[in-house]
Amino acid sequence: MMKMGIRSVALISEAVKADLSLWKRVDNAEFQVVYATPEILLLPTSYFFKKMLHNQKSPFIANLVTVAVDECHIPNESKLDFRPCYSMLGRLRNCLPNATFAGFSATLTPVDIKDFTRTANLNRPAIIHELVR
């Protein structure tokens, strides 16, 4: 994305640990696209959860347009032992009422759609099925 002129960052545990100022840059809305896992965002010990999520004056929160959830089939109850933070997506939705939420998966079943809709507190789900090759 950087080659296309889109300021982006991937918040993975290694990057966050190596560059502690990264969160400040995210909070100051220096990036147009921020990639992060539910664990990075929703663990009670994370900077985002403690400092940014509940601060509507945060430039990042104020400018947030879309939250895209990859692997959105994971909230299926049989898979939550693997990634328990996916069960907390509804908290994220409740704190970011103006953001659009989008879920993506290559293996989504009707049960997974129902689970993701419930887990992420989506009150007006628009489901688009498209196979891209």
Positions of predicted regions on the chain:
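Short beta-strand/turn micro-motifs composed of small residues
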Residues: 12, 69, 105
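Conserved nucleotide-binding/hydrolysis micro-motifs of P-loop NTPases
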Residues: 15-17, 39-42, 73-74, 106-111, ...
